[in-house]
Amino acid sequence: MLERTLRVLEYNKVKEQLLEHTASSLGRDKVKHLVPSTDFEEIVEMQDTTDEAAKVIRLKGSAPLGGITDIRSNVKRAKIGSMLSPNELLDIANTMYGSRNMKRFIEDMADNGVELPILETHVAQIVSLYDLEKKITNCIGDGGEVVDSASDKLRGIRTQIRTAESRIREKLENMTRSSNAQKMLSDSIVTIRNERYVIPVKQEYRGVYGGIVHDQSASGQTLFIEPQVIVELNNALQEARVKEKQEIERILLMLTEEVAVEADIVLSNVEVVANLDFIFAKAFYAKRIKATKPIVNNERYMDLRQARHPLIDPEIIVPNNIMLGKDFTTIVITGPNTGGKTVTLKTVGICVLMAQSGLHIPVMDESEICVFKNIFADIGDEQSIEQSLSTFSSHMVNIVDILEKADFESLVLFDELGAGTDPQEGAALAISILDEVCNRGARVVATTHYPELKAYGYNREQVINASVEFDVNTLSPTYKLLIGVPGRSNAFEISKRLGLSDRVIEQARNHISTDTNKIENMIAKLEESQKNAERDWNEAEALRKQSEKLHRELQRQIIEFNEDRDERLLKAQKEGEEKVEAAKKEAEGIIQELRQLRKAQLANVKDHELIEAKSRLEGAAPELVKKQKVNVKNTAPKQQLRAGDEVKVLTFGQKGQLLEKVSDTEWSVQIGILKMKVKESNMEYINTPKQTEKKAVATVKGRDYHVSLELDLRGERFENAMARVEKYLDDAQLASYPRVSIIHGKGTGALRQGVQDYLKKHRGVKTFRYGDMGEGGLGVTVVELK
């Protein structure tokens, strides 16, 4: 494909927009090297592939391409024996995870009945390297640091380092806190110079501490001295750090060697995910410009329905129907300048280039396009200053080149053919050039403002005239392409609308020939007839589509109703049974807990209450629900409830005491040792006489209440985790724990954020923080309870 054609049709601007939808540098590299194909089979496959990716986006909204980076150079370095850095190894692990995740994503969709044969073929080439991926992530943290657990030796060395640092700091801090030190030190701090711990000593007291001077302040008044008493400790610390560095290098070399062993597979996987990134970028771009998959034919004709230029705002562009190659092989668009002829010409060219690049094009469904071996375009004023060529000469140089190369597999686009010279000679040249290209079997779209070419379409069987509609009322083009209607100047109508007198206009009409007037009148009537015919056709087509859509919708609804009816009934029954079973299990757990507490003599619970509660749950679920509804209706509290009131909780048949109102319809109720939320409609007020001494609510304190000091939420779903946090905090408060730990892991951070958002609202939480280095760091939240 000629570079000049790609430039004048703004193909690279389309590629720039396509680049915005890539997820990695791998995909961007593919886009930068994208050129139109001329192979029919390849183009069909590319269109089908883009269509499958577009289907994925319609169903899922996106594709999991995050975390993928260009690791090819790193893998090649590993292959020749270079040691990779922690971040380079982490990039490799993340890319391996991304490729594995993408493979699983496509295969899961296919397993669920989504037809994606081409994408399945792509992901089938991805080889999972899970073991290598885990080895890297087990040794290297998210921040690119080699973690303590990378090896037992590294863990031991870092323990030594922390111990040595602690001893050094302790000694130095004791020195800085002494009363004598205040006058000798510039500041009571411990700092580091040249990787050794030092203290800032005033110049005049340098001999007091002995040791080694490592640095001085800009003024020279302060010396950073390593006191003699910690020199040996600092030496031991440095030795440990050297060992740490050596062990880290050993681990990195080991991991690099593992990568080198699998280098060919890793590189192959990278190529697959690069192609997938490229494919999905095409699909996302299609969604952005509202493009569809064209039918690609091998019969040298195109039928672009409601075609739009992809670089023009779809809100302002006027779509057009453009057909070429069946009933006619050449379209000559005539009419005045600034009427949108060039936009129409470029729309044809860019749609063909996009389609042959595997991109969907901005047209309606069922549009067709063919494959051209060559696309030639002579558009715009590109005269060469160096060659001192005029506008006409510049165009003619390009046209000569086109005439030498154009054949029956070519698409030729001429903009203002014959312009830039004497109108009569220019029109004659334009006709001859069109005849030459048409005789070679090429498909041609040409624009011109020469009136002589209006008759050209009527004298040649394979040529048709066209024009861009002009609205005389608004004095502006509508940009609507009218196939079969030649353009006219509209000069008389425009002048009349602008106020020129009828007398002057009539005199002007007398100056042109009768034949010309007849032709203009004929064109006007033809234009009006075409408008009416097109309007009627559009109305009929709209009604047909509406009827077909309604028919399809009714059929779909009937099928769905018949298919889903039994399934929904079964699902509802199953869900009901699951809820009842879950309620039974929960009640069993409560009963078991109460019995254990009774054995520990921490609560006063009667056997007949346990048996009665269990017997109610053992009954049929519909009966239980029915009884509860009746009870709720008959026993809804009529009295204004207050904190401290005694109530009967109908679900359990137990008495409780109101603690506080948590919402318009719910109270926090203490039932024995348990505290729970209960709706007002599910409780019955008990009228008890006031006593001079309040009866204490049963509480549980001390170590005998077996609640763990930490709650592990790793692997839990978000909703389940929040429910466990709520119950755990209640239990911990009952056990009088001052501090507990909640383990949520690092992960994506969603669970961690959810836990901390909940802690902010919990009344029993005094404060909370992340765990320290020995407590689990960012993977743990330590909670101080009130």
Curated annotation (Swiss-Prot):
Signal peptide segment: none
CDD domains to which the protein is assigned, alphabetical: ABC_MutS2, ATP-synt_Fo_b
Keyword terms, alphabetized: ATP-binding, DNA-binding, Endonuclease, Hydrolase, Nuclease, Nucleotide-binding, RNA-binding, rRNA-binding
EC number annotated for this UniProt entry: 3.1.-.-, 3.6.4.-
Coiled-coil spans in chain: none
Keyword field contains Hydrolase: yes
Binding site for ATP: G335, P336, N337, T338, G339, G340, K341, T342
Segments forming domain Smr: 711-786
One GO BP annotation of this record: mismatch repair
Keyword Nuclease recorded: yes
MF terms (GO), sorted A to Z: ATP binding; ATP hydrolysis activity; ATP-dependent DNA damage sensor activity; endonuclease activity; mismatched DNA binding; ribosomal large subunit binding; rRNA binding
Entry's family note: Belongs to the DNA mismatch repair MutS family. MutS2 subfamily.
Role played: Endonuclease that is involved in the suppression of homologous recombination and thus may have a key role in the control of bacterial genetic diversity. Acts as a ribosome collision sensor, splitting the ribosome into its 2 subunits. Detects stalled/collided 70S ribosomes which it binds and splits by an ATP-hydrolysis driven conformational change. Acts upstream of the ribosome quality control system (RQC), a ribosome-associated complex that mediates the extraction of incompletely synthesized nascent chains from stalled ribosomes and their subsequent degradation. Probably generates substrates for RQC.
Subunit structure: Homodimer. Binds to stalled ribosomes, contacting rRNA.
Protein name: Endonuclease MutS2
Gene name, Swiss-Prot/TrEMBL: mutS2
